[in-house]
């Protein structure tokens, strides 16, 4: 992360962290409003689709067990870069695939990517919160919520005229470039 004074929380740092949380919410919630399109791409029944969706938890649980050590070793900034790149790639694959097997692999990897990003961003924020002696994480989670809401609004506006593949690919590339 950028070097800021450890004893104070500057507005530029608040802005950077808000962008990080906003973009995280925007990206990881982008598939939720398009789940009917994901199911249609896979041509599976509801039970199978629910099972396929739940496989992301495998990657998430594994990363929750080892993510702290990874972030400690490579740093929060690098972990967020890796996480955001992996989220972008796996979400693009999820939006394009018609194969349940490919979907499972991408889903597991996306769960891991989301977890490492979350561990790195929240861990860094909690560390800064301790350093400056101010509660800052609730506002940043508010930025995450605004990003998630923006993702739903984008999906509402484009779903009728834009395929899930174009929608998610475009959004992931834009978010990744900004991140």
Where are the predicted features?
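Residue-level signature of mid-helix packing/kink "hotspots" within the transmembrane helices
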Residues: 29, 56-65, 148-149
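Small-residue (Gly/Pro/Ala) motifs that create kinks and tight helix-helix packing interfaces
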Residues: 35, 67, 147-159, 163, ...
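Small-residue hotspots at the loop-to-helix junctions and early N-terminal turns
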Residues: 43-50, 138
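Conserved MFS/SLC helix-loop-helix module at the cytosolic interface between two early adjacent transmembrane helices
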Residues: 62-101
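Cytoplasmic helix-loop-helix junction between adjacent transmembrane helices
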Residues: 106-142
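Symmetry-related core transmembrane helices of the 12-TM Major Facilitator Superfamily/SLC fold
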Residues: 166-179
């Amino acid at each position: 992360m950028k070097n800021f004074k450890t004893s104070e929380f500057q507005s530029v740092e608040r802005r950077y962290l808000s962008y990080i949380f906003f973009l995280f919410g925007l990206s990881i919630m982008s598939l939720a409003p398009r789940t009917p399109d994901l199911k249609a791409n896979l041509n599976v029944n509801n039970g199978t689709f629910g099972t396929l969706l739940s496989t992301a938890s495998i990657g998430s649980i594994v990363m929750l067990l080892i993510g702290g050590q990874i972030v400690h070793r490579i740093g929060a900034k690098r972990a967020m870069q890796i996480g955001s790149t992996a989220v972008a790639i796996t979400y693009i694959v999820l939006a394009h695939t018609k194969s349940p097997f490919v979907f499972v692999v991408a889903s597991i990897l996306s769960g891991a990517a989301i977890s490492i990003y979350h561990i790195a961003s929240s861990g860094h924020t909690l560390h800064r919160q301790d350093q400056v002696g101010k509660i800052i994480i609730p506002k940043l989670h508010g930025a995450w919520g605004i990003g998630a809401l923006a993702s739903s609004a984008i999906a509402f506006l484009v779903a009728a005229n834009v395929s899930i593949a174009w929608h998610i690919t475009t959004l992931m590339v834009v978010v990744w470039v900004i991140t």
